[in-house]
Regions:
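Symmetry-related core transmembrane helices of the 12-TM Major Facilitator Superfamily/SLC fold
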Residues: 166-184
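C-terminal transmembrane helical hairpin of 12-TM major facilitator-type secondary transporters
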Residues: 273-311
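Helix-loop junctions at membrane interfaces in 12-TM secondary transporters
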Residues: 91-105, 292-303
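Cytoplasmic helix-loop-helix junction between adjacent transmembrane helices
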Residues: 104-145
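Structural signature of the two symmetry-related core transmembrane helices
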Residues: 76-90, 173, 275-290
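Helix-loop boundary and gating motifs at the non-cytosolic
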Residues: 2-55, 211-249
Length: 311
């Protein structure tokens, strides 16, 4: 991938994602352990918190994507979304209770819902047939790098300061500040002849192609029955009796996911996306079946590797 194919604004957005994912992934594998081991929450409470957080992001993405089309600007939503997520990060470190975790996770996912569609639209405005793969590949690479560095930073902090989860929540605010700084360097791109979108998101849905509606319906159904990754982390902790090993398993998953994305993308071009997607769902089922009956720590690595291939 040649650097000349990557516009400066895409590089800036890459650093925004790098630091944001670093902060988010410091906390993602730590939060369920903090909830259960420190605050004494049940698995049901963990699931409810994750459900509230994720459905918040899902409901907001379409609305703010449409709103950014209407106003013809992306950067304001990018600053607002990343800024809100940054402010949410340290809450459980300052107020170590379940309410603070709920507020933090919900605000963080609200920020994600605000920024995701406008950010992707801005990335798309810089892409064409010659560089779209390079642009989105670069951004995904920076995103994944942050997703690996974040949990490793959390592991280092747990090693140096055992069971001091509050410190990790506070420390995650630091990379978030860097991310917000880079958002102020993001500039909107004006495309000659481009018209602002009209109409509501509901009107877009009514006029959307039938195939799009069917696909979105299937994805929605799968999302409702899909389990959060936090339960795999908690199961790994129960089996290994180690916070650090459970988080390392999650890091391993991210590495496999990053390494497998491109080759499986090529396979989907060759054999068809339906076949690869169907195979992925089969692997997903095997992984959860395996975690239900996992007998030994060694199998954590095998199952997380398979889960990375599915993702």
């Amino acid at each position: 991938m040649k650097r000349k194919n990557i516009p400066r604004q895409v590089v800036v957005l890459g650093f925004v994602s790098l630091f944001t994912d670093m902060a988010s992934e410091m906390l993602y594998p730590v939060t369920p352990i903090f909830l259960t081991a420190v605050l004494g929450s049940s698995m049901a409470v963990v699931g409810i918190i994750e459900g509230i957080a994720e459905i918040t992001a899902a409901l907001l993405k379409g609305y703010f994507g449409n709103l950014s089309d209407k106003v013809g600007r992306r950067s304001i939503f990018i600053v607002l979304g990343y800024g809100l997520s940054a402010l949410a990060k340290p809450f459980p470190g300052i107020f170590p209770n379940i309410s603070a975790v709920v507020i933090s996770r919900t605000a963080d996912r609200t920020g994600k819902g605000i920024r995701t569609a406008p950010r992707d639209a801005l990335l798309g405005s810089y892409s064409d047939n010659n560089n779209s793969g390079a642009i989105f590949g670069f951004h995904r690479g920076m995103d994944t790098l942050g997703a690996v560095i974040g949990p490793l930073a959390a592991i280092l902090m747990l090693y140096l300061f055992p069971d001091n989860f509050q410190l990790i929540f506070l420390a995650a605010f630091v990379p978030s500040v860097f991310a917000v700084y880079f958002t102020f360097l993001v500039k909107d791109r004006k495309i000659p002849g481009q018209k602002r979108a009209k109409g509501s998101y509901a009107e877009f849905w009514r006029s959307a192609p039938k195939q799009f509606k069917i696909l979105l319906l299937l994805i929605t159904i799968f999302s409702f029955v899909n389990s959060s990754d936090v339960f795999l982390i908690l199961k790994s902790r129960d089996v290994s009796d180690s916070n650090i090993l459970a988080i390392l398993g999650y890091v391993f998953y991210n590495l496999i996911y990053a390494g497998a994305s491109y080759p499986f993308g090529k396979l989907s071009d060759k054999f068809g996306k339906n076949i690869i997607y169907g195979g992925g769902l089969l692997v997903f089922s095997l992984v959860y079946f395996g975690f239900a009956f996992i007998p030994h720590t060694f199998f954590i690595w095998i199952l997380f590797a398979l889960y990375g291939l599915y993702s």
